[in-house]
Amino acid sequence: MRARRGLLRLPRRSLLAALFFFSLSSSLLYFVYVAPGIVNTYLFMVQAQGILLRDNVRTIGAQVYEQVVRSAYAKRNSSLNDSDYPLDLNHSEAFPPTTTFLPEDFTYFANHPCPERLPSMKGPIDINMSEIAMDDIHELFSRDPAIKLGGHWKPADCVPRWKVAILIPFRNRHEHLPVLLRHLLPMLQRQRLQFAFYVIEQVGTQPFNRAMLFNVGFQEAMKDLDWDCLIFHDVDHIPESDRNYYGCGQMPRHFATKLDKYMYLLPYTEFFGGVSGLTVEQFRKINGFPNAFWGWGGEDDDLWNRVQNAGYSVSRPEGDTGKYKSIPHHHRGEVQFLGRYALLRKSKERQGLDGLNNLNYSANVTYDALYKNITVNLTPELAQVTEY
């Protein structure tokens, strides 16, 4: 009788345990879906730490190998006569470092191109992450008559090397935009770039489509001016160095390489998020961003694939120049896009079908003193993809 009761209790306990673990896993999956930003921050931190550990192991291995080689050559040289030349592992043919930024007394000429390494670019920026009203930002920059409607500015003392359109995807981040403008506008002025800000705001009930907003912003910006450089900039990323030059180059550029919330480590080699830059020619060649990524995640990885498929490589700033601070979020982020991995597996096949060439939209355009606001209601029907 007791044995029978024990047998009855065992399945019941197993069932309760199974229900408990099912409930726990369901709750975890739901949290990952509705709050992907928090979850992925921790995942990226762990991934970055793993990469750092791997690199440290490689460095230690190289140092051990060097010491072994040094010891071997030391023994060899001690047994040779004085006519032999010992190997000097400290010898280097590299030239001594030069000062790359111009001196304070540099003279500008109105008909000469602006240099890329100006004396006004000091390096570290004094970051102020406290919230500020947009009216206060307007008041702050209203003293500069050179800033035109829509945040358009160009230097008067030299010819700007790049005409830069700053594209900012936007939804419900009204407390972030003034903080970004407070830091970014003076930095771009110190870099002597011609620039304007485009805030592309998504309304409606569909999940956030960051990539499609960038495509819309590109199309609208090119109606204003023959821009030659595009900066795709998240609204919550604040650069920490004004030597992170927001011009473009022969290869696409990833600016935000070290983000504070990822412990200033690159989460993975193909990471292309936060702030990136391409020339207009490069952006058209890769067919822009994909339009099919609804919700959080995947579009930057697809952009990386597009860049590689087009024969480009990605350049990054050296050292700590690519450091950024992330403005804390006071609300829940966008939901996770669960279909991104299936799309990423077909990146190459989709590249010629999904992007600038299948984009349709209707925009409501208004002007702020410091940016052009482009409001769109995006739906999947506006960027349908044929079978591939």
Swiss-Prot record:
Highest levels in heart, brain, liver and kidney with lower levels in spleen, lung and testis. Its main location: Golgi. Pathway: Protein modification; protein glycosylation; Sphingolipid metabolism. Belongs to the glycosyltransferase 7 family. N-acetyl-D-glucosamine binds at G298, E299, D300, D301, R340. It comes from Mus musculus (Mouse). The chain crosses the membrane at residues 15-35. It comes from the Eukaryota. This is Beta-1,4-galactosyltransferase 5. InterPro entries: Galactosyl_T, Galactosyl_T_C, Galactosyl_T_N, Nucleotide-diphossugar_trans. Mn(2+) binds at D236, H329. UDP-alpha-D-galactose binds at P169, F170, R171, N172, R173, F208, N209, R210, V235, D236, Y264, W296, H329, H330. It catalyses: a beta-D-glucosyl-(1<->1')-N-acylsphing-4-enine + UDP-alpha-D-galactose = a beta-D-Gal-(1->4)-beta-D-Glc-(1<->1)-Cer(d18:1(4E)) + UDP + H(+). One of its GO terms (molecular function) is N-acetyllactosamine synthase activity. Disulfide bonds join C114-C158, C229-C248. CDD domains: b4GalT. Residues 1-14 are cytoplasmic. Gene3D superfamilies: Spore Coat Polysaccharide Biosynthesis Protein SpsA, Chain A. Catalyzes the synthesis of lactosylceramide (LacCer) via the transfer of galactose from UDP-galactose to glucosylceramide (GlcCer). LacCer is the starting point in the biosynthesis of all gangliosides (membrane-bound glycosphingolipids) which play pivotal roles in the CNS including neuronal maturation and axonal and myelin formation. Plays a role in the glycosylation of BMPR1A and regulation of its protein stability. Essential for extraembryonic development during early embryogenesis. The keyword Metal-binding applies. Its EC number is 2.4.1.-, 2.4.1.274. GO terms for cellular component: Golgi cisterna membrane.
